Curated annotation (Swiss-Prot):
It holds the Pfam family Lipoprotein_2. It comes from Borrelia hermsii. Its main location: membrane. This is Variable large protein 23. A lipid is attached at residue 19 (S-diacylglycerol cysteine). The lineage of its organism: Bacteria, Pseudomonadati, Spirochaetota, Spirochaetia, Spirochaetales. Belongs to the variable large protein (Vlp) family. Delta subfamily.
Length: 345
Protein backbone atom coordinates (compact mmCIF):
# COMPACT_ATOMS: atom_id res chain seq x y z
CA UNK A 1 0.00 0.00 0.00
CA UNK A 2 2.83 2.36 0.94
CA UNK A 3 4.52 1.60 -2.38
CA UNK A 4 1.32 2.51 -4.28
CA UNK A 5 0.97 5.82 -2.36
CA UNK A 6 4.64 6.64 -2.98
CA UNK A 7 4.21 5.93 -6.68
CA UNK A 8 1.13 8.19 -6.87
CA UNK A 9 2.93 11.02 -5.05
CA UNK A 10 5.94 10.68 -7.36
CA UNK A 11 3.68 10.77 -10.42
CA UNK A 12 1.90 13.91 -9.17
CA UNK A 13 5.25 15.55 -8.46
CA UNK A 14 6.47 14.82 -12.00
CA UNK A 15 3.26 16.25 -13.47
CA UNK A 16 3.60 19.42 -11.41
CA UNK A 17 7.24 19.83 -12.43
CA UNK A 18 6.26 19.35 -16.06
CA UNK A 19 3.49 21.97 -15.84
CA UNK A 20 5.65 24.47 -14.01
CA UNK A 21 8.50 24.12 -16.47
CA UNK A 22 6.13 25.28 -19.20
CA UNK A 23 4.83 28.09 -17.01
CA UNK A 24 8.19 29.65 -16.23
CA UNK A 25 9.43 29.62 -19.81
CA UNK A 26 9.71 33.26 -20.86
CA UNK A 27 7.52 34.39 -23.72
CA UNK A 28 9.81 35.83 -26.45
CA UNK A 29 7.37 38.70 -26.99
CA UNK A 30 7.51 39.66 -23.32
CA UNK A 31 11.30 39.36 -23.25
CA UNK A 32 11.63 41.65 -26.27
CA UNK A 33 9.19 44.28 -25.08
CA UNK A 34 10.76 44.31 -21.63
CA UNK A 35 14.28 44.59 -23.01
CA UNK A 36 13.33 47.48 -25.31
CA UNK A 37 11.23 49.20 -22.63
CA UNK A 38 14.24 49.08 -20.33
CA UNK A 39 16.53 50.30 -23.07
CA UNK A 40 16.24 53.84 -21.73
CA UNK A 41 18.39 52.80 -18.80
CA UNK A 42 21.09 51.89 -21.29
CA UNK A 43 21.20 55.48 -22.51
CA UNK A 44 21.91 57.03 -19.13
CA UNK A 45 25.60 57.27 -20.04
CA UNK A 46 24.63 59.03 -23.28
CA UNK A 47 22.82 61.78 -21.40
CA UNK A 48 25.69 62.05 -18.92
CA UNK A 49 27.95 62.65 -21.93
CA UNK A 50 25.60 65.37 -23.19
CA UNK A 51 25.62 66.95 -19.73
CA UNK A 52 29.41 66.98 -19.68
CA UNK A 53 29.53 68.55 -23.13
CA UNK A 54 27.06 71.29 -22.17
CA UNK A 55 29.02 72.06 -19.00
CA UNK A 56 32.22 72.19 -21.04
CA UNK A 57 30.67 74.52 -23.62
CA UNK A 58 29.58 76.94 -20.89
CA UNK A 59 33.17 76.88 -19.62
CA UNK A 60 34.83 77.84 -22.92
CA UNK A 61 37.51 80.51 -22.47
CA UNK A 62 39.86 82.46 -24.70
CA UNK A 63 42.64 79.92 -24.16
CA UNK A 64 40.40 77.01 -25.18
CA UNK A 65 42.00 75.45 -28.23
CA UNK A 66 40.20 75.24 -31.54
CA UNK A 67 41.01 71.51 -31.50
CA UNK A 68 38.97 71.24 -28.28
CA UNK A 69 36.01 72.60 -30.24
CA UNK A 70 36.66 69.87 -32.80
CA UNK A 71 36.52 67.32 -29.99
CA UNK A 72 32.98 68.42 -29.12
CA UNK A 73 31.90 67.57 -32.65
CA UNK A 74 33.81 64.29 -32.50
CA UNK A 75 31.98 63.41 -29.27
CA UNK A 76 28.65 64.29 -30.88
CA UNK A 77 29.36 61.98 -33.82
CA UNK A 78 30.45 59.12 -31.53
CA UNK A 79 27.39 59.58 -29.31
CA UNK A 80 25.01 59.37 -32.29
CA UNK A 81 26.80 56.23 -33.49
CA UNK A 82 26.48 54.66 -30.03
CA UNK A 83 22.74 55.32 -29.83
CA UNK A 84 22.24 53.99 -33.37
CA UNK A 85 24.15 50.77 -32.70
CA UNK A 86 22.32 50.00 -29.46
CA UNK A 87 18.92 50.49 -31.06
CA UNK A 88 19.75 48.51 -34.18
CA UNK A 89 21.30 45.65 -32.20
CA UNK A 90 18.15 45.28 -30.12
CA UNK A 91 15.86 45.41 -33.14
CA UNK A 92 18.04 42.86 -34.99
CA UNK A 93 17.55 40.37 -32.15
CA UNK A 94 13.77 40.74 -32.35
CA UNK A 95 12.78 41.59 -35.90
CA UNK A 96 9.13 40.48 -35.69
CA UNK A 97 7.80 43.75 -34.33
CA UNK A 98 7.56 45.73 -37.57
CA UNK A 99 6.05 48.89 -36.06
CA UNK A 100 8.90 49.31 -33.63
CA UNK A 101 11.49 48.60 -36.33
CA UNK A 102 9.93 51.24 -38.59
CA UNK A 103 10.06 53.88 -35.85
CA UNK A 104 13.67 52.99 -34.99
CA UNK A 105 14.76 53.02 -38.65
CA UNK A 106 13.15 56.43 -39.20
CA UNK A 107 14.80 57.86 -36.07
CA UNK A 108 18.18 56.54 -37.20
CA UNK A 109 17.87 57.88 -40.77
CA UNK A 110 16.19 61.22 -40.04
CA UNK A 111 17.98 62.15 -36.84
CA UNK A 112 21.02 60.15 -35.76
CA UNK A 113 22.66 59.75 -39.18
CA UNK A 114 22.13 63.40 -40.12
CA UNK A 115 23.50 64.76 -36.84
CA UNK A 116 26.51 62.43 -37.09
CA UNK A 117 27.17 63.50 -40.69
CA UNK A 118 26.96 67.18 -39.76
CA UNK A 119 29.30 66.73 -36.79
CA UNK A 120 31.81 64.81 -38.90
CA UNK A 121 32.23 67.78 -41.22
CA UNK A 122 33.57 69.85 -38.32
CA UNK A 123 36.40 67.52 -37.29
CA UNK A 124 39.09 68.98 -39.56
CA UNK A 125 37.75 72.52 -39.57
CA UNK A 126 39.09 73.83 -36.30
CA UNK A 127 42.93 73.78 -36.12
CA UNK A 128 45.18 73.77 -33.05
CA UNK A 129 45.51 77.41 -31.93
CA UNK A 130 43.48 79.01 -29.13
CA UNK A 131 40.17 80.67 -30.00
CA UNK A 132 41.40 83.92 -28.42
CA UNK A 133 44.51 85.93 -29.16
CA UNK A 134 47.65 87.04 -27.37
CA UNK A 135 48.61 90.61 -26.58
CA UNK A 136 49.91 92.38 -29.73
CA UNK A 137 49.01 89.42 -31.94
CA UNK A 138 47.82 90.35 -35.43
CA UNK A 139 44.31 89.69 -36.70
CA UNK A 140 43.98 87.05 -39.43
CA UNK A 141 41.13 85.80 -41.62
CA UNK A 142 39.84 82.31 -41.00
CA UNK A 143 40.61 79.72 -43.67
CA UNK A 144 37.76 79.75 -46.21
CA UNK A 145 37.52 75.95 -46.51
CA UNK A 146 37.38 75.64 -42.73
CA UNK A 147 34.65 78.26 -42.40
CA UNK A 148 32.56 76.68 -45.15
CA UNK A 149 32.93 73.24 -43.58
CA UNK A 150 31.70 74.58 -40.23
CA UNK A 151 28.76 76.31 -41.89
CA UNK A 152 27.77 73.22 -43.86
CA UNK A 153 28.02 70.87 -40.88
CA UNK A 154 26.16 73.14 -38.47
CA UNK A 155 23.47 73.73 -41.09
CA UNK A 156 22.88 69.97 -41.38
CA UNK A 157 22.53 69.60 -37.62
CA UNK A 158 20.35 72.70 -37.20
CA UNK A 159 17.99 71.36 -39.87
CA UNK A 160 17.34 68.38 -37.60
CA UNK A 161 17.37 69.85 -34.10
CA UNK A 162 15.76 73.29 -34.51
CA UNK A 163 12.31 74.09 -35.84
CA UNK A 164 11.90 76.93 -38.35
CA UNK A 165 10.40 79.17 -35.65
CA UNK A 166 13.30 78.54 -33.25
CA UNK A 167 15.82 81.30 -33.68
CA UNK A 168 15.92 84.26 -36.06
CA UNK A 169 18.88 84.64 -38.41
CA UNK A 170 18.14 88.36 -38.76
CA UNK A 171 17.64 89.10 -35.05
CA UNK A 172 19.07 92.49 -34.12
CA UNK A 173 18.65 94.97 -31.27
CA UNK A 174 21.78 97.10 -30.87
CA UNK A 175 22.46 100.48 -32.50
CA UNK A 176 23.72 100.65 -36.09
CA UNK A 177 26.90 102.52 -35.16
CA UNK A 178 27.89 99.82 -32.67
CA UNK A 179 27.31 97.04 -35.18
CA UNK A 180 29.37 98.77 -37.86
CA UNK A 181 32.29 99.21 -35.47
CA UNK A 182 32.62 95.45 -34.92
CA UNK A 183 34.44 95.33 -38.26
CA UNK A 184 37.44 96.92 -36.53
CA UNK A 185 37.91 93.71 -34.50
CA UNK A 186 39.13 92.18 -37.75
CA UNK A 187 41.49 95.07 -38.58
CA UNK A 188 45.26 95.28 -38.75
CA UNK A 189 45.82 98.79 -37.41
CA UNK A 190 47.64 99.34 -34.12
CA UNK A 191 44.52 100.98 -32.67
CA UNK A 192 42.02 98.40 -33.95
CA UNK A 193 40.26 96.12 -31.51
CA UNK A 194 39.63 98.55 -28.69
CA UNK A 195 37.75 97.76 -25.52
CA UNK A 196 34.84 99.85 -26.84
CA UNK A 197 34.67 97.88 -30.09
CA UNK A 198 34.84 94.62 -28.16
CA UNK A 199 32.00 95.86 -25.96
CA UNK A 200 29.92 96.46 -29.10
CA UNK A 201 30.57 92.87 -30.18
CA UNK A 202 29.63 91.59 -26.71
CA UNK A 203 26.43 93.65 -26.87
CA UNK A 204 25.49 91.97 -30.16
CA UNK A 205 26.20 88.52 -28.71
CA UNK A 206 24.23 89.26 -25.55
CA UNK A 207 21.27 90.75 -27.40
CA UNK A 208 20.28 87.53 -29.16
CA UNK A 209 19.83 83.84 -28.36
CA UNK A 210 22.02 80.88 -29.18
CA UNK A 211 19.29 79.68 -31.53
CA UNK A 212 19.53 83.02 -33.39
CA UNK A 213 23.26 82.46 -33.86
CA UNK A 214 22.74 78.90 -35.09
CA UNK A 215 20.12 80.03 -37.61
CA UNK A 216 22.43 82.81 -38.83
CA UNK A 217 25.14 80.20 -39.44
CA UNK A 218 22.71 77.77 -41.07
CA UNK A 219 21.34 80.46 -43.39
CA UNK A 220 24.74 81.95 -44.18
CA UNK A 221 26.02 81.55 -47.70
CA UNK A 222 29.52 80.26 -48.31
CA UNK A 223 32.62 82.41 -48.06
CA UNK A 224 34.02 82.94 -51.55
CA UNK A 225 37.45 81.70 -52.61
CA UNK A 226 38.75 85.19 -53.39
CA UNK A 227 39.84 87.86 -50.94
CA UNK A 228 36.88 89.04 -48.87
CA UNK A 229 36.77 92.66 -47.75
CA UNK A 230 35.10 93.33 -44.42
CA UNK A 231 33.09 96.24 -45.84
CA UNK A 232 31.73 93.86 -48.50
CA UNK A 233 30.90 90.96 -46.15
CA UNK A 234 27.25 89.93 -46.53
CA UNK A 235 26.91 87.02 -44.08
CA UNK A 236 28.47 85.22 -41.13
CA UNK A 237 30.84 83.13 -43.25
CA UNK A 238 32.24 86.21 -44.99
CA UNK A 239 32.73 88.03 -41.68
CA UNK A 240 34.71 85.04 -40.44
CA UNK A 241 36.90 84.86 -43.54
CA UNK A 242 37.29 88.61 -44.17
CA UNK A 243 40.85 89.87 -44.56
CA UNK A 244 42.45 91.90 -41.78
CA UNK A 245 41.55 95.48 -42.63
CA UNK A 246 40.53 98.60 -40.73
CA UNK A 247 37.00 98.92 -42.09
CA UNK A 248 33.47 99.02 -40.72
CA UNK A 249 30.75 96.52 -41.53
CA UNK A 250 28.74 98.17 -44.30
CA UNK A 251 26.30 95.72 -45.90
CA UNK A 252 22.87 95.74 -44.22
CA UNK A 253 22.55 91.92 -44.22
CA UNK A 254 25.77 91.69 -42.20
CA UNK A 255 24.77 94.41 -39.73
CA UNK A 256 22.51 92.12 -37.72
CA UNK A 257 23.36 91.08 -34.18
CA UNK A 258 22.77 87.39 -34.94
CA UNK A 259 24.98 87.53 -38.06
CA UNK A 260 27.75 89.41 -36.22
CA UNK A 261 27.71 86.90 -33.35
CA UNK A 262 27.72 84.01 -35.82
CA UNK A 263 30.64 85.52 -37.74
CA UNK A 264 32.65 85.98 -34.54
CA UNK A 265 31.91 82.40 -33.46
CA UNK A 266 32.96 81.00 -36.85
CA UNK A 267 36.16 83.07 -36.98
CA UNK A 268 37.05 81.95 -33.44
CA UNK A 269 36.46 78.25 -34.20
CA UNK A 270 37.85 78.00 -37.73
CA UNK A 271 41.49 77.46 -38.70
CA UNK A 272 43.72 80.55 -38.70
CA UNK A 273 40.97 82.94 -37.55
CA UNK A 274 42.25 85.71 -35.27
CA UNK A 275 40.93 89.03 -33.97
CA UNK A 276 42.57 92.41 -33.48
CA UNK A 277 43.28 94.04 -30.13
CA UNK A 278 44.78 97.46 -29.54
CA UNK A 279 48.55 97.22 -29.24
CA UNK A 280 50.01 97.06 -25.74
CA UNK A 281 46.59 97.32 -24.11
CA UNK A 282 45.77 94.25 -22.08
CA UNK A 283 42.24 95.34 -21.19
CA UNK A 284 41.36 95.52 -24.90
CA UNK A 285 42.83 92.07 -25.55
CA UNK A 286 40.83 90.66 -22.63
CA UNK A 287 37.64 92.30 -23.88
CA UNK A 288 38.10 90.95 -27.41
CA UNK A 289 38.88 87.47 -26.10
CA UNK A 290 35.83 87.59 -23.86
CA UNK A 291 33.60 88.38 -26.82
CA UNK A 292 35.06 85.53 -28.89
CA UNK A 293 34.72 82.99 -26.07
CA UNK A 294 31.16 84.13 -25.34
CA UNK A 295 30.10 83.71 -28.98
CA UNK A 296 31.56 80.21 -29.22
CA UNK A 297 30.18 79.10 -25.85
CA UNK A 298 26.68 80.35 -26.62
CA UNK A 299 26.69 78.68 -30.04
CA UNK A 300 27.96 75.30 -28.88
CA UNK A 301 25.93 75.03 -25.68
CA UNK A 302 22.71 75.79 -27.56
CA UNK A 303 23.59 73.27 -30.28
CA UNK A 304 24.41 70.48 -27.83
CA UNK A 305 21.26 71.08 -25.76
CA UNK A 306 19.15 71.01 -28.94
CA UNK A 307 20.77 67.71 -29.99
CA UNK A 308 20.19 66.21 -26.55
CA UNK A 309 16.53 67.24 -26.57
CA UNK A 310 16.05 65.84 -30.07
CA UNK A 311 17.57 62.47 -29.12
CA UNK A 312 15.46 62.36 -25.96
CA UNK A 313 12.31 63.09 -27.98
CA UNK A 314 13.18 60.34 -30.46
CA UNK A 315 13.65 57.75 -27.73
CA UNK A 316 10.29 58.75 -26.24
CA UNK A 317 8.68 58.23 -29.65
CA UNK A 318 10.13 54.71 -29.72
CA UNK A 319 8.67 54.07 -26.25
CA UNK A 320 5.29 55.27 -27.49
CA UNK A 321 5.51 52.80 -30.38
CA UNK A 322 6.27 50.05 -27.86
CA UNK A 323 3.19 50.96 -25.85
CA UNK A 324 1.10 50.61 -29.01
CA UNK A 325 2.58 47.20 -29.76
CA UNK A 326 1.82 46.00 -26.23
CA UNK A 327 -1.79 47.15 -26.46
CA UNK A 328 -2.24 45.52 -29.87
CA UNK A 329 -0.80 42.26 -28.56
CA UNK A 330 -3.24 42.26 -25.65
CA UNK A 331 -6.14 42.93 -27.98
CA UNK A 332 -5.09 40.10 -30.31
CA UNK A 333 -4.85 37.67 -27.40
CA UNK A 334 -8.24 38.74 -26.09
CA UNK A 335 -9.89 38.02 -29.46
CA UNK A 336 -8.08 34.70 -29.92
CA UNK A 337 -7.81 33.03 -26.48
CA UNK A 338 -6.99 29.63 -27.94
CA UNK A 339 -3.89 31.01 -29.69
CA UNK A 340 -2.90 32.91 -26.54
CA UNK A 341 -3.14 29.73 -24.49
CA UNK A 342 -1.00 27.83 -26.98
CA UNK A 343 1.68 30.52 -27.02
CA UNK A 344 1.87 30.51 -23.21
CA UNK A 345 2.65 26.81 -23.03
Amino acid sequence: MRKRISAIIMTLFMVLVSCNSGGVAEDPKTVYLTSIANLGKGFLDVFVTFGDMVAGAFGIKADTKKSDIGKYFNDIEKTMTTVKKRLQDEVAKNGNYVKVKEVVDKFVADVLDKIAAGAKKQLRATGDAAIGMLLNEDAAPAEVASVNSLVKGIKEIVGVVLKDNEGDAAATKTADAEKKSVGKLLGKGAADGTETQAAAASASIGAITGADILQAIAKSGKAGAGEIKIEEAKNAAEIAAAKADSKDLAIDSAKKDAVIAAGIALRAMAKDGKFAAKNNEEKSANAVNGAAASAVGKTLSTLIIAIRNTVDSGLKTINEALATVKQEDKSAEATNPAEATTSGQ
